[in-house]
A protein has these predicted regions:
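Ribosome-associated RNA-binding proteins
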Residues: 1-177
Length: 177
């Protein structure tokens, strides 16, 4: 079975550092990243454009992050246009692949991306928004992607903000406490 780079880094380096820093009695108390949620909210376009948009979004996320994901769709009709919400849940190996690509390749290339503050950590969960995730890619539905805000939620197993902060800072996420 293929082990990705971030998972081996967690097992060999981060787990050991957290164990020595906080003196856990049991190794199962050491926090880890449970899952990653990506949401795209309030798309308002005609129904044919929405499904083409969804198809291209799935293709792009598969090509960029090499993921297979489960998406939940919520459609509400508003006269001629529709309100469309998309939620992508990444678990186990997929969230490590996504975080590895996000931290090492895409966050440094996003224009005007600031360091995340401690206010984005709530009960051990990190929430942040990215306005222009697909600025690097140019294709015919670029106008649809430029207007959208991607909300990324990283859930950890700890409820303590300081433990979550130390875990995420060891993953080299740009976060300031």
């Amino acid at each position: 079975m293929k082990t990705d780079r971030l998972n081996s880094y967690y097992l060999n380096q981060i787990k050991y550092d957290l164990y020595l820093k906080f003196y856990f009695k049991n190794i199962y108390e050491i926090p880890k990243i449970a899952n990653v949620n990506i949401s795209l909210k309030k798309l308002k376009y005609k129904s044919k454009i929405i499904f083409i948009f969804l198809f291209y979004l799935v293709l792009i996320l598969n090509q960029i992050f090499n993921l297979k994901f489960v998406s939940n769709k919520n459609l509400k009709s508003n006269s001629n246009k529709q309100n469309f919400n998309l939620l992508i849940n990444l678990n186990k190996n997929n969230n490590n692949i996504f975080l590895d690509n996000l931290i090492n390749f895409y966050l440094p290339n996003i224009k005007n991306f600031k360091v995340l503050s401690k206010n984005t950590l709530i009960n051990g969960n990190l929430n942040f928004k990215i306005n222009n995730l697909f600025d690097i890619i140019k294709f015919k539905f670029n106008s649809l992607f430029n207007d959208q805000i991607f909300i990324i939620n990283i859930k950890t197993t700890s409820l303590n903000n300081f433990l979550s902060y130390s875990l995420l800072s060891l993953y080299l996420l740009p976060i300031k406490y």
